[in-house]
Each structure stands twice: as structure tokens, then as C-alpha cells.
């Protein structure tokens, strides 16, 4: 056995015996905060459970959150984007990962939430039939979305506005659940569908449609976060130490996703978050989880605010939304603390 192969084998065998929190420590992402940092104001944390596999850092953070002093971590389950947004605004959930464009819409609607950090880029992909080769080809076409007010339609409206189309006039929107929309795309009964993991992985595996836009590599979408971390405004105001500790755990978990995609994929299957290991592994390998230090989430809020304003979905200016709906204190501190 070569020395290099022996090193690789030893590392795999060693990592195989670690929990994910142990992996974080082994990779230099030690879960313990600085000794001088006070304990969290509460040991209970309620996280809204996001949609799709791309929110894996929130799942991986379970043990890291315990190490941060959270003894009682609850998941507030959501089946739709609306289910996700309501608990954050009401305070039934304290924190949670959510898609960037819908968050901007909620800020415009004066929801009492605050965006705290960017977590990753590149999770959504636009699939089309042969009639759609570029975003501009969506003019006059039929596009399926689960909701006409939030969720994928906010990203799609941003995309068509960016290329000069009017989503209110130029697109025929139809509402269908994700499973139905994928089947309609396969049958050619709709022209396009915006998918989030594991939908893109499934569509590619089944050779349904083709990729028109991949936000992990296609500009300008690859320059901006698709998933952000947000919190209930009152919780963040009254629990700053707990907020920082929770943000730290989730951002460290994003690093684990980037560094150990296979182990995270197995974790997601073993924990019941998804039944398909191959789709989970592809998601972990394809979504760039290592950009939270270098990309500026404020740029993301500004970009989507401008696009959604052009699309007629919001009224507020980017400056107002950034001033009232973002708080980068914790992220800025953690960028210094968690330097690579």
C-alpha cells in the first residue's frame, strides 16, 4: 500500500468514527466558543425547518448547537414557503435558513425579521423544455410555481426582470405542487420549472428537460447568496449572545458540508431528511457552501430588492430594507473569529 493511499485510508477510517461535531473539531472548526464569552440567554432554540436539501447546514448544526449551550433545540416543521415564513415573523421560531428573494419580499411587507448572514450560493436551477433555451425565451410561455406570492416565483420574477421582461405580463403562471410540476415538465405541458435540491438532481437523473440557468455557475446569480440565515427581530434583540452562538454553529456546519460532503449526505439519509443518498451527495458536492466568508450578503439583499422592485413585487428601496431588515454584527465578528 502506498504512503499516500495509507494516509487517505487512515483519514477515512478515522473520520468514519467521528460524529459530525467531532469532524468539525478535527477539521479545525472547534465547536467551543471563546472562554470569555458568556452563556446564551436561553438554552432553548427553535429553528424553522427549511425546505430542500440545501439547508443541510441547519441539520448538521444539531450537535454544534448543543456545544454552544443549547440544551433544547426544536424544529418548527414547514411544508411550504408560507409555513416557513409565518413562524419566523410570529416568534414561534427564533432562527432559520430561508431563500433570499422571498426574504426580501417579507421585509418589504414589514415582517419583524432580520437577516443575519449568507449561508450558501447556487442551489436553484431553471429547467426548460426545448422551447426554452434562455431566460428571454420564457416570454409567452407557461411556468409552474407552487405559490403566486412567495417562494420560487420571487426568484423567477427577479430573473425575467433582469433580462427586461415583465413577469406580470410576459409569463403565464400556473400553480402546481413540486411533484406535479416536474411531471408536467416531463410531459411538455409546461415550459419551465425552477427547482431546489433535490429537484435538480432528480430532473437531471431522469433526463427531464434541460438546465437553462444553474445559479452555482451562471452569472449574475452565482455572485449572490440564494439562502440566508434570518431571525425573529425580537429574539435577536433580546438574545444577542444566543444569536451569535447559533449563527456560529450554522456557519461552522456550512464548512462541514463543504469539506465532508459524503459524510454529510450519509447523515442526511440516516436522520431521515431525505431517502436518496445519491441526490444528497450531489447536492453537497454541487452547492458552494464555502462562500459565506467572502461574499457580502448585503449585496444579495440589494440585488434582489432592485430586481423585485423592477418586477413590481416590492415597493421599498434597497436602502430601506437593508437599514431595517439586516444585522451584520454577528457575521462580521464570526468572520474574524473563524478565519481559515
Ranges and model annotations:
Residues 65-70, 217-222, 289-297:
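Short, solvent-exposed loop/beta-turn-alpha elements that line the ligand-binding surface or hinge
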Residues 1-13, 20-24:
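N-terminal secretory signal peptides
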Residues 237-316:
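Secondary-structure end/capping motifs
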Residues 6-15, 29-35:
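Twin-arginine (Tat) signal peptide motif
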Amino acid at each position: 500500500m502506498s504512503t499516500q493511499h495509507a494516509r487517505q485510508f487512515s483519514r477515512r477510517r478515522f473520520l468514519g468514527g467521528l460524529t459530525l461535531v467531532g469532524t468539525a473539531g478535527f477539521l479545525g472548526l472547534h465547536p467551543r466558543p471563546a472562554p470569555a464569552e458568556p452563556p446564551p440567554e436561553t438554552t432553548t432554540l427553535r429553528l424553522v425547518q427549511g425546505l430542500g436539501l440545501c439547508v443541510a447546514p441547519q441539520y448538521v448544526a444539531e450537535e454544534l448547537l448543543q456545544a454552544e449551550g443549547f440544551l433544547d433545540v426544536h424544529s418548527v416543521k414547514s411544508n411550504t414557503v408560507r409555513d416557513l415564513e409565518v413562524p419566523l415573523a410570529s416568534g414561534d421560531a427564533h432562527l432559520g435558513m430561508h431563500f433570499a428573494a422571498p426574504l426580501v419580499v417579507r421585509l418589504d411587507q414589514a415582517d419583524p425579521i432580520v437577516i443575519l448572514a449568507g449561508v450558501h450560493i447556487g442551489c436553484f436551477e431553471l429547467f426548460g423544455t426545448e422551447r426554452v433555451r434562455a431566460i428571454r425565451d420564457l416570454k409567452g410561455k407557461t411556468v409552474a410555481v407552487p405559490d403566486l406570492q412567495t417562494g420560487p416565483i420571487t426568484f423567477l420574477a427577479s430573473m425575467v426582470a433582469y433580462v427586461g421582461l415583465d413577469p406580470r405580463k410576459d409569463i403565464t403562471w400556473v400553480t402546481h405542487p413540486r411533484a406535479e410540476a416536474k411531471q408536467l415538465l416531463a410531459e411538455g405541458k409546461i415550459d419551465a420549472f425552477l427547482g431546489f435540491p433535490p429537484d435538480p438532481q432528480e430532473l437531471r437523473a431522469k433526463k427531464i428537460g434541460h438546465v437553462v440557468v444553474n445559479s452555482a455557475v451562471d452569472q449574475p446569480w452565482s455572485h449572490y447568496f440564494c439562502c440566508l440565515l434570518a431571525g425573529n427581530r425580537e429574539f435577536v434583540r433580546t438574545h444577542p449572545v444566543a444569536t451569535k452562538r447559533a449563527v456560529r454553529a450554522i456557519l461552522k456546519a456550512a464548512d462541514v458540508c463543504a469539506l465532508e460532503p459524503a459524510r454529510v449526505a450519509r447523515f442526511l439519509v440516516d436522520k431521515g431528511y431525505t431517502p436518496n443518498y445519491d441526490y444528497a451527495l450531489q447536492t453537497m458536492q454541487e452547492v458552494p457552501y464555502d462562500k459565506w466568508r467572502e461574499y457580502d450578503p448585503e449585496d444579495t439583499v440589494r440585488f434582489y430588492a432592485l430586481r423585485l422592485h423592477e418586477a413590481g413585487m416590492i415597493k421599498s428601496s434597497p436602502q430601506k430594507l437593508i437599514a431595517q431588515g439586516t444585522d451584520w454584527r454577528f457575521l462580521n465578528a464570526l468572520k474574524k473569529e473563524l478565519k481559515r
